[in-house]
Amino acid sequence: MLLIIVVLVGTLIYFLSFHNKKRHGLPPGPKPLPIIGNIKDMPPKGVAAFRHWLKHKDTYGPVSSVSVLGQPLILIHDREAAHYLFDKSSGKSSGRPSANFGGRLCGFDQILSLQQYGDTFKRHRKLVHRQMGTRAGAAKFRQIQDVESHRFLLRSLDNPGNLMEHIRKEAGGVILKATYGYSIEPHKPDPLVHLVEFMVEGISIVVVPMKFVVDFLPWLEYIPECLPGMSFKARARRWRTILNNTIEAPYQFVRQQMAKGIQFESYVSSLLTQEKLKGGNDTLDETYEADIKRTAAIMYAGGADTTVSTIQSFVLAMMVYPEVLKKAQAEIDNVIGPDRLPGFEDRENLPYINSMVKESLRWMPAVPMGAAHKADDDIYYGDLCIPKGSFLLPNVWWFLHNPETYQDPERYDPDRYLEPRNEPDPDSNCWGYGRRICPGRLLADESIFIVIARVVAAFDIEKDVDEQGNTIEPKVEFTTEGALSRPVDYPYRIKPRNAKCVDLIRAVEKEHPWDKGDASLLQQDMVVL
């Protein structure tokens, strides 16, 4: 009872002292209750946020608002409004929601995803852009993508029941090799892939605005952990440890390899070499070294997460719409022929495959409710005033499923981007906005292309059947925990199209024999969870 009284009194004091903001000029929304605001209007557990907020569009219009403990949350269901607020007004809308839990307690404010817009953010983004943010920069890693996508086919051939794991391993293999020159374990789970996936899971959860009460009531941090409701402290410590290990373990691996002169050229080794040549000695500026480590750590979340979700959606779509797979295979057969797998050099000659990349990003977007921005100043949009400090949340799923923009939007239909329909490219909405657009999007786009093209060329994908031989209809549903979504687990059947395809897949064993994994070279106490 005492704890309840303390919480209520503290909440009231905090609300009256810091969050007594007027609604004048705010976008319309449900009337808030005293003190707690619209807390009852927040998405319930188990309901996808993008679906929950859709009803606000119909009731309150394309730009609406709610507030919790005086904190405004602006809900955007209009593409033009989103691009005005995030692109044209990027000087005022590039902040991130202040996250006491995810930022200060977990430490995720060290990395791009949760950093506030400022000097550190600009330095980090410049580093990433310089290495991977251009077509030429992304193209440097095509050899890695070529090998890892081919190995993905081989894993899928030899062990088709673990396709989802193979998708994650392919994405992790590309990013970790490109970022650190690290080779994943070829035939068993890789501890570094496992570690970074835990980090991404944490980021996905903490970036959801209004997820943790301690973000609104920071004084809860000082309540004894033994009392009810304080379990967030142990969770924060675990995620901080995972983040710190994700930053340090692979970075130290690169330094050790460079000391021996056996490093593979990568994002980290290139930056360290450039700094050494510039400085003429082995002493690194502490700030620059921290920038390298922290930007490297976010690479996986910046590219691999979208790649994994998108490829999983693609596989699901091939079962639900088998005619699409047949049409794509016909294009591959006509353009490439039966004697080789498609490569990056074929992309401009594969318009239908390119459209499949776009449609896979649109159909089940990896971040359907976008990543929240924060208004760093008052923003005026029409007759609305979005006050400084507001959280801005774009419903990306709606932008990509608005029937006024996309014909029959629930259908997976690559033809929508081709003549004569020419529906809008989803690219401008599925990678973020403004100064916070995903810096690894070009690398991720190339990974998605090469995997889709080669799966289409080599495999048939079908619905699974039960023990009685009845077809199992897969569910087209999202996971609901965190900002990052993927299809819920589904049954499937995948098999090589023919004997020639088996030969093409197995050729990688001769062309690129399995590397010995580098896991044993990592500091083991950092990667054992």
UniProtKB/Swiss-Prot annotation:
Give the knockout phenotype.
Leads to complete loss of culmorin production. Does not affect the trichothecene biosynthetic pathway since 15-acetyldeoxynivalenol (15ADON) is still produced.
Q: Name one GO molecular function term.
A: iron ion binding
- Catalytic reactions on record: (-)-longiborneol + reduced [NADPH--hemoprotein reductase] + O2 = culmorin + oxidized [NADPH--hemoprotein reductase] + H2O + H(+)
What superkingdom does the record give? Eukaryota
EC number of the protein: 1.-.-.-
Protein localization: Membrane
Annotated membrane topology is:
Single-pass membrane protein
Regions crossing the membrane: 2-19
Q: Where does heme bind?
A: 438
Top-level EC class as recorded in UniProt: oxidoreductase
Matches recorded under InterPro entries: Cyt_P450, Cyt_P450_CS, Cyt_P450_E_grp-I, Cyt_P450_sf, Cytochrome_P450_fung
- Transport among keywords: no
Query: Which cofactor does this sequence's record say it needs?
Result: heme
GO cellular component annotations, sorted alphabetically? membrane
Going by the UniProt record, its keywords in alphabetical order are:
Glycoprotein, Heme, Iron, Membrane, Metal-binding, Monooxygenase, Oxidoreductase, Transmembrane, Transmembrane helix, Virulence
- What Gene3D superfamilies would the database entry show? Cytochrome P450 (1.10.630.10)
What protein is this chain from? Cytochrome P450 monooxygenase CLM2
Organism field: Gibberella zeae (strain ATCC MYA-4620 / CBS 123657 / FGSC 9075 / NRRL 31084 / PH-1) (Wheat head blight fungus)
